Design a protein with these regions (language model features):
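A composition-driven surface/loop motif
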Residues: 9, 20-286
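Bacterial Sec-type N-terminal signal peptides, specifically the leucine/valine-rich hydrophobic h-region
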Residues: 14-17
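Bacterial N-terminal signal peptides that target proteins for export
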Residues: 1-8
């Protein structure tokens, strides 16, 4: 009987995540657990959430869909689920800030999806100096940091204020789709080590050294940046606008505007950028 219950639970989780992928753009998932924050207090729509509190962090320990609302002050959302499980975080007018670290740290998951609810405005702000429990640690190092694949999508707006290092950092593949995304950073504004894809999104990147970066060098199918499907990207940065190790592609119908202090496109591999799309000005290039 116990074995059967576990099988049913696994099947329910799989159906929930399939529903996440099929949820129409801008709508929330009715199967989500609702998490409402007020300062450092949390109220939930169900009793058994699988969330534990560790040193000021609300730790999600089970895969599934979670809808986040309200204002989390001086805290952190941490995702720490088995590598075989996926997590969807629905931001529905959600604000979070941390005085000591990143407000969102995806430590482990198969992948994580941040879904921005229609009409919602969401803001995350990190600390100017991070405190690590182990001085040897250097992660997280971005306002939103993911150790695994991360997708940000939906028709809402997300503001990310990176005050310590990177604005958004992803160790694997970073995908941005359909949403409005405004990010500031001190070092790299957005970085996906393996890849960055921006599809049909409106993205504004300010501050920092490099604006969009992917630097994996040991795999020929990674280390790429793709801007597609009419994406609109505005960049104002101190160094390179777009930097990748393997390839950069900017499709026709997209626009990349703004100013950079370094190269507009920096890649030792393949560059395929539509000339009309590239409207950005470089301080070092004619």
């Amino acid at each position: 009987m116990k074995k059967l219950s576990l099988i049913l639970l696994a099947a329910l989780l799989a159906l929930t995540l399939v529903a996440c992928d099929r949820t129409p753009a801008g709508t929330t998932n009715p199967a989500s657990i609702v998490l409402t924050f007020n300062g450092n207090q949390l109220s939930t729509s169900v009793q058994d959430t699988g969330i534990v509190v560790e040193g000021g962090a609300f730790v999600i320990t089970r895969g599934g869909s979670y809808e986040l609302k309200g204002d989390l002050s001086g805290g952190q959302i941490k995702v720490a689920v088995p590598k075989t499980e996926q997590v969807e975080l629905i931001f529905n007018n959600f604000t979070a800030s941390s005085n000591t670290s990143a407000p969102l740290y995806i430590e482990s998951a198969d992948k994580c999806v941040i879904f921005l609810a229609a009409g919602s405005v969401n803001t995350l702000t990190d600390a100017t100096l991070y405190q690590y429990a182990n001085p040897a640690d250097d992660k997280p190092n971005a306002c939103i940091y993911s150790s695994d694949d991360l997708t940000i999508k939906g028709t809402g707006t997300l503001n990310v204020n990176g005050n310590y290092n990177n604005g958004i950092g992803c160790k694997n593949d970073l995908r941005i789709k359909d949403c409005t995304l405004n990010v500031t950073g001190v070092n790299n504004i957005i970085k996906g080590n393996d890849s960055v894809e921006i599809e049909n999104a409106t993205v504004k990147l300010s501050g920092g050294e490099d604006a969009i970066k992917s630097d994996t060098a040991d795999r020929t199918d990674k280390g790429y940046i793709l801007i597609s499907s009419g994406a609109k990207v505005e960049i104002n940065c101190l160094d390179d606008a777009i930097q990748a190790t393997m390839s950069i592609t900017v499709e026709a119908g997209c626009t990349v505007t703004g100013n950079c202090g370094g190269d507009t496109l920096n890649c030792p591999g393949t560059i395929n950028a539509d000339e009309a799309a590239m409207q950005i000005t470089s301080a070092t290039q004619p």
